[in-house]
Amino acid sequence: MTVKTPAELKTLYESISFDLQTTYTGPLGQEYAVSGTHLRLWAPTAQRVEVSLYRKGSGGEPIGTLPLERGQQGVWSIYLPGDQHGRYYTYTVTVDGISRQTGDPYARAAGVNGTRSMIVDLARTAPSGWERDVRPVIPPEQRAVWEVSVRDFSQDAASGVRPAWRGKFMAFTQQGTTLHGDGIHPTCLNYLKRLGVKYVQLMPIFDFGSVDEAKPLRRQYNWGYDPTNYNVPEGSYSTDPTRGEVRIRECREMIAALHAAGIGVVMDVVYNHMYRNENPLNDTVPCYFFRQNEDGSFSNGSGCGNEFASERPMARRYMIDSILYWAQEYHIDGFRFDLMGLYDVETINAVRAALDTLPGGRDILMYGEPWQGGGSQLHRYEANKANLAMLNERIGIFCDDTRDTIKGGCFNAREPGYVEGRPGSFWDIGGAVAAWCRSDRLPPHAPSQIVNYVSAHDNFTLWDKLLLVRYEKPEFTAADGTALAQNRLAAGIYLTSFGLPFLQAGEEFARTKKGKCNSYRSSPALNRLDWERAEKYHALVDYYRGLLALRARFPRLSSTDPHAPDALYFFSLEQPLVGWQLPAQWGDGAAWQALCVFYNPTETSKVVPLPVGRWQMLSDGISSSLWRGPARVYEHEAVLMPYSATIFGQI
């Protein structure tokens, strides 16, 4: 078939006949065996495909170039006899007389910077005991997600991590790390086990293009939302990016170490765009995998130059294949979808259905950002907030309604939210507590679809936002008692709300990026987790720790029952106070018969009436672990401290 322009390609790809002729369900990529390896590439518009073989992942001439044979549905294949483990390769794909050299879109391993793919025997990359690694069983009431970049986690010299492992996958495997090695103040994995979060969401760990793996990291830094190879771990996070098997083994070691600590791993996936338009997908089948405008040019709903055409059959298949590969070969416990609004509902639901077919697959988390990064040519139902009712009930969304209600809008640094005293915002706090199940604004299938948060890697840290609202020229590194109290209040709200709690790493120790709202390529020093700050703000860390443990002892807040929030009873209080009562679900093992919670966003103490009964104070807004000590029992009324979330349990 001969096509000349991107517009003609668009017409071709959107035709039913093209789908019928080219949709393929057989194996793609490498099929390794000691006796030989099959390579298969879907390239239906190509006139010729060749594979060049190399001894190394970079440099040197090919040791041979061989033609592939065209088969049905546009699949090209070749069989390479003998043990090919460790052999690097590239394809040369010729379409309309233009030849492009590229990697394998289905590559599982790659050389430095991902330019050359590598044939790999995955069994040889398995760390010791990998066959015994299993996903931890984490009940809903214990679920809370802590988001971090592999680089940020340990690159601070104070982390106590050995220098060669700082900023690498292997840092997650080092046991017993402490601040400057003092043996007292925990850091990294040691810290996570004490904090009590049960999921770590890792910012992109697939191979991305914005860091040069061939050069020392030093001042190089990027979050990694720049995909190059979707099925290959990032080389800069390995101790040797020149050897394709090392990054696989070390990524698996990291996951196994987290699992051994009882912590699940959520992978941040960015199928919505690729780093460059010249990439293995586009070089193999020009324009097919990316959404197009009417003139054939790339649509840019990602804001990054292109957007993935999830609605096209082989693009949808690629995305599902990739997700299943990570779930099966890396034992991933959850997937966070960047710009999920750029995918069609049918594809996202198909991903959920595919995961559910795996052993334990129904427990794999799945949630995403229900928005886009710009105008899109997706003319189907988008997997966004407006179409939440069309998504599977076990596909969650980041709730910007909750985020903005609590702390203020993220696009205006000075805009206050409830915790900073925004007038009228108390009306929406009730909606947030109920995970919007009792609101027409955002009715989910179940409260567990709502991801509650006030900070993530995008936009200002919570601490910086609080200071920017209060001060014209904030001192971000200075202690501030009011901001600390507002920070505690913000956490107290979303950690006592229905839904899935989520926090940016370091939110619990007043993480600052000194007012930088988008640090995706800022200095490593600005982005790193400051472990000395974690010790300085240890009382705030303990506050989060206590709330997480308290929440786990009242399972109804994490219920998947769509009617669970109906049991909330909101009190009539003076504005802007908010108070509510929630009985425990019979037989769920709750530590208290009911919870009674009050939020006070004012700078003065307030007296509030209590419901009939005996109420133990669990948290006074400063200490969230009062429930661990001698019972402080109240009846009739209680005093709320300024800027506080006060929690009582009925006994």
Question: Which stretches of residues belong to each language-model region?
Answer:
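Substrate-binding/active-site clefts of carbohydrate-active enzymes
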Residues: R151-Y330, L339-P359, L365, Q377
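Conserved, mostly hydrophobic/aromatic
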Residues: L41, Y91, V148, L202, ...
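C-terminal accessory region downstream of the catalytic core in glycan-modifying enzymes
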Residues: A479, A483, L529, L547-A549, ...
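The feature marks proteins involved in alpha-glucan
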Residues: M1-V34, G71-Q174
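Glycan-recognition and catalytic regions of carbohydrate-active enzymes
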Residues: Y24-G26, I493-K516, R528-L595
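Conserved alpha/beta catalytic core and glycan-binding cleft of carbohydrate-active enzymes
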Residues: V120, R352-A353, T357-A510, K516-Y520, ...
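Carbohydrate-binding surface patches
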Residues: E31-Q47, Y569-P611
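C-terminal beta-strand-rich structural cap/linker in extracellular carbohydrate-active enzymes
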Residues: A43, H85-R87, P630-I651
